[in-house]
Amino acid sequence: MAEDEPPGASLKPLVFRVDETTPEVVQSVLLERGWSKFDQQEQNMEDWNLYWRTSSFRMAEHVNVKPWQCLNHHPGTTRLTRKDLLAKHLQHMERLYGAPLYEFLPPTFVMPHDYSKFVAEYFKEKQVLDAKLSYWICKPAELSRGRGIIIFSDIKNLIFADTCIIQKYICNPLLVGRYKCDLRVYVCVTGFKPLTIYIYQEGLVRF
């Protein structure tokens, strides 16, 4: 026992809890850093410090979290991570602060709610461009890593079963060495009041 350790105190490893959606790499990193994995059969339901999963938590789970526990999602963050909700918030901000600040946002339609608006815009642009092809991109609202994305020029090829967004496809993107690219930056948001963000020093550039 260390000299400055209170009598009777024992240092226990931090415990992380996962579900079937938690990536293996997350578990491996936590184990390498000395964490212990939560065992529902051996431990009480409150004997964990971090619950990490890909899906969001219900508000009741946020309310009932103990002082020694953390969840890897803040309440309400799906408003930013779901493509349809993000689009609605950006459009609302555009109305509040003016279009010039939001020129980076291509024309966006949330389907099926904006279907009539999209059809009107589609045929309006088709009439203006005449024989020239115009491309649109359709993205499922809740999927990631390029899953379910389609690019189309003919509205007959538009097929969707769930909520999605349709955006004007950017045909002249920024290229680096004639390749498309994007940046992936990793951050940890620890709070919103005040907004506190830690940016990881290393990121990815994808081509």
Language model features: what each stretch is:
Residues K117, L129-F207:
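Catalytic core of tubulin tyrosine ligase-like
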